Amino acid sequence: MESEDYKRYEFKKALEELKDLHGRGTELISLYIPPDKQISDVVQYLREEYSTSSNIKSKSTRKNVLAAIESIMSRLKYYKQPPETGLVFFVGHIATRGDQTEMYTKIIEPPEPIQTFMYKCDSNFHLEQLESQLKEKDIYGLIVIDRKEATVGFLKGTRIEVVDYEQSLVPSKHHQGGQSSRRFERLIEIAANDFFKKIGEIANNAFMPLIKDINAVFIGGPGATKEYFLEKDYLRNEIKQKVKDLFDIGYTDESGLRELVEKASESIKDMKISREKDIINRFLREIKKPEGGLGVYGEDAIINALKSKNLDLLIISDTLKKRRYTYKCPVCNDTKTFTEKPRETPLCDKDNSEMELVDEDDLVEDLYKLADEAGTNVVFVSEDSDEGRLIKTAFGGLAGIMRYVPAIAP
């Protein structure tokens, strides 16, 4: 059974593929069908488009558009009604080498319901409705503040986004006594109030458009400034109600946002970044054990653990893009597999014959199939956190935790 992580990975990969495709003319059809749309109504609409497209002046464009519409109508015969989230067709002749084109068909059942029926015939596929479904749902508002500076931002999934950084004009405390000192103190408080108002406006303008999507707001900073800022009327009530916690942190610039997220993720474990950090840190603890822990990394070691059904958890970087090339000897049928296509045709180790390329697969898809067969849990991690970047840069984007330490052959 496919995990939500894997479905999102496949969905994102499909959109990246579609984005790179182009037609010679306006020959690529994007058809979005909401779940409550009658298939018979869609077919009738396509018949009308077919009639209209018969008048296209360019012979090749007319031929290709009509072929695409026919292809969609023939496939719609297999649907009594759209799936629960709707149906999206991407069909048309895409440009290949030189002046050549080839028919391309992609049918997607999106992760979220399609809201609007749409038919577009263009030189590229229209992906806007689907791309909006990739937007991160795990969103938190971030504010770090003291009297000298403040930074407002978001945590979206595992990615920190800076909205604005501001330095204040609040002068340092005046140590001389007398009337001039009291007047100077009043000026300091006026300047501080103006600065807090400005930061409140920045936060209000940033957070309010997304207030329904924001899970919580965290405020951090040194001293009591953060409490004062929250208690007064600098933030809208809707935002105040979302404030989950306040944290003592040492910095109020961009590094302060990272420190705030670190503190928040320690106390609130249902955050996506918390879950990723916990998983990766567990793996790191295992590989550091001097007696040999359950941690495993490296493509060959991961595949061996999967094939022996000894991998409990597979960790994959969500930016990992590799293919596996399988070559077969025409004489003895031995095979060799590579994750980078060899520059020269490989030779068979037994009879020195030139081997033939018989299969080319996506590495992540292959690993997921093996994981499914082995009952292995699969987690995709991003490169937005330090831990996630470490999985990609130090371990090649693949890591795992075994069920038991395999016995070493004597």
From Swiss-Prot:
Cellular localization per UniProt: Cytoplasm
UniProt KW keywords: Cytoplasm, Protein biosynthesis
GO CC term, one of those recorded: cytoplasm
Keyword Protein biosynthesis: yes
Membrane-crossing residue ranges in chain numbering: none
GO molecular function terms listed in the Swiss-Prot or TrEMBL record: translation release factor activity, codon specific
UniProt superkingdom: Archaea
Matches recorded under Pfam families: eRF1_1, eRF1_2, eRF1_3
Assembly with partners or alone: Heterodimer of two subunits, one of which binds GTP.
NCBIfam families from the UniProt entry: aRF1_eRF1
UniProt-listed PANTHER family: PEPTIDE CHAIN RELEASE FACTOR SUBUNIT 1
Job description of the protein: Directs the termination of nascent peptide synthesis (translation) in response to the termination codons UAA, UAG and UGA.
UniProt family annotation: Belongs to the eukaryotic release factor 1 family.
Full protein name: Peptide chain release factor subunit 1
